[in-house]
Amino acid sequence: MAKYVLALDQGTTSSRAIVFDKKGNIVAKAQKEFDQIYPAAGWVEHDPMEILFSQFQAVTSVFSSSGVKPEDIAAIGITNQRETTIMWDRETGKPVYNAIVWQCRRTAELCEQIKADGMEEYIKDKTGLVIDAYFSGTKIKWILDNVPGARALAEADQLLFGTVETWLIWNLTGGRVHITDYSNASRTMLFDVDNLCWDEKMCEYLNIPMSILPEVKPSSMVYGKVAGGIIGLEDLEGIPIAGAIGDQPAALFGQACFEPGQAKNTYGTGCFLLMNTGEKRVKSKNNLLTGVAWGIGDKVEYAIEGSAFNAGSVIKWLRDELHMIDNAKRCDELAESVPDANGIYFVPAFTGLGAPYWDMYARGCVVGITRGTTKAHFGCIVGLTRGVNRAHIARSVLEAIAYQMTDLLEAMEDDSGITFTELRVDGGASVSDILLQIQSDMIRTIVDRPKTVETTALGAAYLAGLAVGYWKDRDEIAQNREIEKIFTPQMEKSHRDELYKGWKRAVERSRDWAKD
């Protein structure tokens, strides 16, 4: 009997392969980074072939660097950066353009036109989304309208669209399987989340031929098997590909948030707060998003979601652009050296603001800066006085991450009618104790960090394992979850409320900054 499940975790900056055992423990992992492409201001692209090859390299490395053998693998599960859009020629297998990444803002003007056409309510009702350049639909239209030959290929039924998991599955199966799962389809702005089908009106409105769209399947089932003849992956031939899910719902599943009202927050490049709402779709009145979290068998479960575009990326900005820190640990050390941010508020709206604001034209700003900073290379500095040092700025960055999540949590509580009693966390930045303590203080509830923080990959592994009987059911999976540390509120509520009020004022300063 196979011993393990292999998860492919294809992210924004790297591709990873992680092997899990029956207890959800990591047996082996490998990672391969790839290049980010910035053709113009606000544009972000990836090379689809580099995505593919980096993922294949991670897979070969996970076997070569460990004692795990391909015959030990029961199934493969895939999780991916959502919304990122790839289109390719079904005959040659070659992409017609670079992947347009979820962060890319090139379709902001098109989104304004869609709003002007009065489509907001229809899109919100049918797809559970707001109109934003974030989602795949406008990216597809951009490629069809701007890449020479793309629309002609579509009209000849020779063009295929997919988010990243679709691209990987198509290639792993030798071009035999063109599918997506409910969670990824829910992020295209083209999918009817109630009737679980592509929405004809949206496709017609955006002039997107439905023939290019993948078939939508549950998140846990055998889609196909790894084909023979894939260079470097020859020994994986015949292994079932049995799970596919977007990165954030994957983390929700990996955190064993199986009951309505259970929630997780992932601190990665951005921050993503999701709450399981069960088989009931919650329609948000606070600009949060509704989508299918996962489908298993003939049932789907929904999630309500809020996202902040910049979180861990801000710490990287401090390191790479301002040269204030050498690594993320140094940011924590600086932040811990001061009791507060000394009145500083940093709004990390580098690519606009996500929920609940959805302001494509917001830009990053720092307000309340005082004299004394040695690295004052900021886009917007307001209120210079004396007394601030870089420790205050480092702390303001961590506080900004926590403030953004507080915005989302309060909106989510209002929409769902549920008061949070616990927040489960994961992602790279969740290793920061000071960040999680600030978070607990701001949301006034328990924050718990599991022993396994690779919950995105774990969720994909669980779904694949369920499909092939490696795990019996969700009860068995839930027993695997172990808590590493719990954070409880330490700050007086009155002080917390005062700080949060200042954050709201700072956000208003950043809004509409890039609008003509």
Question: PLM ranges: what are they?
Answer:
Residues 64-101, 130-136, 169-192, 217-218, ...:
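Short beta-strand-loop/turn "lid" adjacent to the catalytic site in phosphate-handling enzymes
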Residues 1-97, 125, 232-240, 443-447, ...:
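N-terminal glycine/serine-rich phosphate-binding loop of ATP-dependent small-molecule kinases
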Residues 210-211, 334:
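Auxiliary, metal-adjacent structural segments of Zn-dependent hydrolase domains
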Residues 68-71, 211, 418:
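Structured loop/turn residues at beta-strand edges in well-structured enzyme cores
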Residues 6-8, 22, 108, 114-130, ...:
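Active-site core segments that coordinate phosphate-bearing ligands/cofactors
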Residues 104:
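Carbohydrate-associated surface elements
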